[in-house]
């Protein structure tokens, strides 16, 4: 038996594994993730490594392969647990071991650790005075200045000595050589939690919140670690339930991870958690520097922090004794990784909790179909919060039929009802949020004469017009100058559907010139603290209206917001995705939940071309059960998740002919070698966007009730495809229930 071993956790070594022979006496006990002692290098010095692979085949001549010395006793480290998790990811999500390890293990990369260096006087005052007299006689002004300062203050930071006293590094080195001082270094861990102030507020839980907390804590204390679906209407106080459960877990000496769906939620969430748990809280997000991210992993390993808040990557924080994982807004699509391995944070969290003996809380006002289906079938436990916390009431909702408005001659983006309510709220000095699921000024540019749509020459998508007139492809970044004449027929009737966030901002300023307006989308939030700055401005009352895309409707709590306008509710209904109705319902329900969250009553206006659609009606009524019953019937009829499991096999290649042949081979392989009762293989078909950056893509779908059947198919395909010359220029990815 042979073991693949990595010797260090950094990017450089993750690409390099070393093969060792496993002694006979260890073959029955060695496992993935174990820490082992190995001879390394020409001198065979003994070091430790991590087992990342086991097999019977030697990759090198047998006589050159060294033997593992032994298994390191008592070394079930956080890293070794992460490696076992990587092996689980590899099996469940179709990736290589190295891809899985790079996902879960806290990698160092080439981050230079920040240090605080201090200069310490190590001689007594009498000796120091003798040296001082000598320096005065020799007119050694710099040395005199440094020693005089150290006599008054025996420990001074090196950077202060250099900047304030104007002392060079050479003089400090001379003092070290003379035995006068000692320079000491201390690692400085960057703390990404900034600008958090205020005191902890005591919030009295209502009866439903108390019951939820009591249930979770009681089960936990009895060693009954469960997964809970906390289904609470918007504003029902789910976060307070999280905080109480976390406080209990921390009191037992364990740690907690809180996942948020995207960086836009961090600002307010961190404030609430930091006020409760202080410096034991840290955050992780994609906009932090590599150094900041690495520091948080080190702080977690050292036990300096107990609560990590962040998006799905925070799930891999190397805590030694994890007791609770919270996934807020668990329905969010951001919890599904778009890169290999294409894991879902919810599934991984449940696996981590099962291994660690921990609880999981999935919180949402609009649970994913997967989670609610699991609760309805007894796989997880459902806890409901039916009413808003405090005195908040659910808002009044108006559905506006855009077709009728158009017949009445209203072609503006603000229909009559919305315009009336906006005027009313501005007069009352209350705040307004306007939600649009778009980016840019225009969705697409087309010729009104011949119908030609301006498309990217490299991708099968339309170009988007921005405020400066440029046309841009948001897939590959291609840009083109403003078009005034149709390149196909020469007509000058070329324009776009002006309903992007920038266009809405312009219309608001034109219609309500006195209003103070903020826009929050991908373009205005670039940079490290872009989200925080805009949210702080709005929270502090420095703007009357906040316009934005999806990021403004998710999880924010602004007490003075009493009107939410949804400008184009049904745009997401037309996506080529079986989850389109679910995502539309979730977005609209979340948007409606932003209004009237405190003492003031709220209004929501939903503008739509399909007011009768069940997802829109259910969202307006905040009726999750009505939506679920209709949607699950559709999923059962079509055999879609969560009823059945669905694997998407995506093949991509710059060679269109090769891609067609490869996709046909995969389809035939599944049909001829993997068929079991109830299996369905569909395709191949062109991907929704067939060409991106001159690379073509096709998709094959495989359905079955048993997920393991799909995993077996992936593994069989992988064995035949990896290393095959026929697939050398074809990239194959597998996504299960994506």
Predicted regions and their residues:
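Accessory, non-ATPase domains that flank or precede helicase/AAA+ motor cores in DNA-metabolism machines
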Residues: 1-364, 376-392, 673-676, 701, ...
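A general secondary-structure signal for short beta-strands and their flanking turns/coil
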Residues: 2, 15, 44, 429, ...
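A general secondary-structure junction signal
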Residues: 53-55, 105, 185-187, 436-438, ...
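Short, amphipathic alpha-helical segments that act as regulatory/interfacial helices
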Residues: 87-90, 147, 151, 176, ...
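Generic solvent-exposed, charged/amphipathic alpha-helical segments
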Residues: 87-90, 419, 423, 505, ...
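Inter-lobe coupling/hinge segments of SF2-like helicase ATPases
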Residues: 200-206, 210, 214, 223-660, ...
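Short amphipathic alpha-helix segments
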Residues: 624, 660-682
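A carboxyl-terminal module marker
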Residues: 672-693, 732
């Amino acid at each position: 038996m042979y073991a693949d071993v990595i010797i260090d956790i950094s990017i450089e070594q993750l690409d390099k594994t070393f093969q060792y022979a496993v002694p006979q006496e260890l073959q029955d006990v060695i496992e993935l993730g174990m820490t082992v002692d190995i001879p390394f290098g020409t001198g065979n010095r003994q070091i430790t490594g991590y087992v990342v692979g086991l097999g019977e085949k030697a990759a090198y001549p047998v006589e050159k392969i060294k033997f593992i010395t032994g298994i390191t006793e008592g070394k079930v480290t956080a890293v070794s647990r992460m490696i076992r998790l990587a092996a689980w990811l590899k099996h469940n999500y179709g990736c290589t071991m190295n891809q899985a390890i790079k996902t879960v293990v806290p990698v160092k990369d080439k981050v230079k650790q920040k240090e605080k260096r201090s200069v310490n006087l190590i001689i007594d005052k009498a000796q120091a005075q003798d040296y001082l007299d000598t320096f005065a006689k020799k007119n050694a002004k710099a040395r005199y200045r440094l020693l005089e300062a150290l006599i008054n203050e025996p420990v001074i930071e090196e950077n202060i000595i250099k900047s304030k006293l104007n002392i060079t590094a050479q003089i400090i080195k001379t003092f070290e050589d003379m035995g006068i001082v000692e320079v000491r270094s201390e690692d400085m861990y960057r703390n990404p939690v900034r600008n958090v102030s205020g005191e902890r507020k005591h919030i009295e839980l209502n009866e439903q919140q108390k019951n939820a907390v009591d249930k979770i804590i009681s089960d936990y204390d009895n060693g009954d670690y469960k997964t809970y679906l906390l289904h609470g209407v918007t504003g029902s106080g789910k976060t307070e339930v999280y905080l109480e459960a976390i406080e209990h877990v921390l009191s037992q000496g364990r740690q907690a991870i809180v996942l948020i769906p995207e960086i836009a939620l961090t600002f307010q969430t961190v404030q609430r958690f930091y006020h409760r748990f202080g410096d034991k809280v840290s955050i992780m997000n994609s906009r932090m520097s590599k150094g900041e991210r690495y520091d948080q992993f080190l702080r977690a390993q050292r036990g300096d922090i107990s609560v990590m808040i962040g998006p799905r990557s925070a799930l891999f924080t190397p805590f030694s004794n994890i007791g609770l994982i919270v996934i807020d807004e668990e329905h969010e699509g951001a919890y599904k990784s778009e890169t290999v391995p294409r894991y879902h944070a919810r599934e991984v969290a449940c696996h981590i909790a099962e291994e660690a003996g921990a609880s999981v809380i999935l919180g949402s006002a609009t649970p994913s179909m997967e989670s609610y289906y699991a609760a309805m079938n007894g796989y997880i436990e459902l806890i409901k919060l039916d009413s808003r916390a405090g005195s908040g009431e659910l808002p009044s909702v108006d559905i506006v039929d855009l077709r009728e408005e158009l017949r009445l001659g209203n072609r503006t983006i603000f229909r009559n009802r919305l315009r009336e309510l906006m005027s009313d709220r501005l007069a009352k000095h209350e705040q307004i949020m306007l939600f649009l699921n778009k980016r840019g000024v225009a969705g697409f540019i087309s010729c009104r004469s011949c119908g030609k749509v301006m498309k990217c020459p490299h991708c099968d998508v339309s170009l988007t017009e921005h405020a400066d007139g440029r046309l841009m492809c948001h897939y590959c970044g291609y840009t083109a100058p403003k078009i005034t004449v149709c390149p196909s027929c020469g007509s000058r009737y070329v324009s776009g559907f002006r309903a992007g966030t920038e266009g809405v901002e312009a219309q608001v300023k034109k219609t309500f010139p006195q209003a103070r307006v903020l826009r929050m989308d991908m373009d205005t939030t670039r940079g490290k603290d872009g989200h925080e700055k805009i949210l702080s401005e709005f929270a502090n009352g420095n703007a009357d209206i906040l316009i934005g895309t999806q990021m403004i409707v998710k999880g924010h709590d602004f007490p003075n917001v009493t009107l939410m306008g949804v400008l184009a509710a049904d745009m997401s209904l037309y996506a080529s995705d079986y989850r389109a109705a679910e995502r539309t319902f979730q977005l609209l329900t979340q948007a409606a939940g932003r209004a009237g969250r405190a003492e003031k009553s709220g209004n929501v206006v939903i503008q739509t071309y399909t007011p009768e659609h069940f997802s829109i009606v259910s969202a307006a009524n905040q009726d999750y059960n009505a939506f679920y019953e209709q949607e699950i019937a559709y999923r059962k009829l079509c055999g879609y998740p969560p009823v059945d499991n669905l694997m998407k096999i995506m093949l991509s290649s710059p060679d269109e002919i090769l891609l067609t042949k490869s996709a046909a081979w995969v389809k035939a392989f599944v049909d001829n070698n993997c068929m079991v009762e109830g299996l369905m293989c569909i395709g191949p078909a062109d991907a929704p966007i067939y060409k991106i950056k001159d690379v073509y893509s096709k998709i094959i779908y495989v359905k079955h009730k048993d997920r393991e059947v799909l995993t077996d198919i992936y593994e069989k395909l992988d064995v035949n495809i990896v290393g095959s010359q026929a697939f050398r220029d074809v990239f194959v990815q597998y996504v299960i229930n994506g």
